[in-house]
UniProtKB/Swiss-Prot annotation:
Pfam families: IMPDH. The modification N6-acetyllysine is found at residue 291. The gene is Gmpr2. GMP binds at residues 219-221, 242-243, 268-270, 286-290. K(+) binds at residues 181, 183, 186, 189. It comes from Mus musculus (Mouse). GO terms for molecular function: GMP reductase activity; metal ion binding. This is GMP reductase 2. The keyword Oxidoreductase applies. The active site is at residues 186, 188. NADP(+) binds at residues 26-27, 78, 129-131, 180-181, 269, 285-286, 314-317. InterPro entries: Aldolase_TIM, GMP_reductase, GMPR, IMP_DH/GMP_Rdtase_CS, IMP_DH_GMPRt. It catalyses: IMP + NH4(+) + NADP(+) = GMP + NADPH + 2 H(+). Its EC number is 1.7.1.7.
Amino acid sequence: MPHIDNDVKLDFKDVLLRPKRSTLKSRSEVELTRSFSFRNSKQMYSGIPVIAANMDTVGTFEMARVLCKFSLFTAIHKHYSIHQWQEFASQNPDCLECLAASSGSGSADFEQLEQILEAIPQVKYICLDVANGYSEHFVEFVKDVRKRFPQHTIMAGNVVTGEMVEELILSGADIIKVGIGPGSVCTTRKKTGVGYPQLSAVMECADAAHGLKGHIISDGGCSCPGDVAKAFGAGADFVMLGGMLAGHSESGGELIERDGKKYKLFYGMSSEMAMKKYSGGVAEYRASEGKIVEVPFKGDVEHTIRDILGGIRSTCTYVGAAKLKELSRRTTFIRVTQQVNPIFSNSQ
């Protein structure tokens, strides 16, 4: 029988962080590096826990080279060949600890994943990515991958509720990707009516994961550095970005010139374009759940990274968190009806 959950669920746009007394004199005093020990792999992580999404327009080797310099992480998309992986690994050995090899749950994807991890043993992270992390098939797949790679750290998703976070962690995953439908080029909510407001999903899933000594990634829904800070404040251990990293020199996607202006194509991995590119088209039994956009060309991604990290540091100073680790403990969200003054909203 249908049921309505009357609890209010919130998104990033519905809240602001309340400022609090601080002893910090400067943003430069804020430490953004986090260290984690993972539940199932027993591996250690140290870095700034912002991840480039495993989309072919974002999770590129070019992106990984730059993000690695800032101690950020990249989930490399699954469409690189083993030869491309080997070439990148030989030229960029220092980056290999800051990236994950991605896979879907199909047998061909898994075979390629095995080849990559056997050829490049320095890669210690696996990103298992499906649109619907609630299927029994996916849970069994996570168990199989854990059995095959007992010492690799496994990211798995996507889900939005605590009980599924717990099931995936108990099945062998270390870090659960949280988010269904919040992405800038995702149309799942429009096509299916399924989803969950991202802020509430992160808070509830973080609580479930941390109770089992697991971790979560807030995946999708960030449109500005303030949203990234809110995700960390809500309890996310990592934040994954797609649209915010699209449109750069290091991003994938075709470069288009029109009327003297440059654009880069950015599209969801369930869009018609992605399915034509990798699957020969949209299967007759399914619908496209992603859109295609032309992002104004932004140049090198380094400037955007500095802007994001600067915003997070500033958040920490406003709430009195000397370390990113302390941000969630210093967070009080207030519900709002308006985020910003809209008078010059069309100006850069």
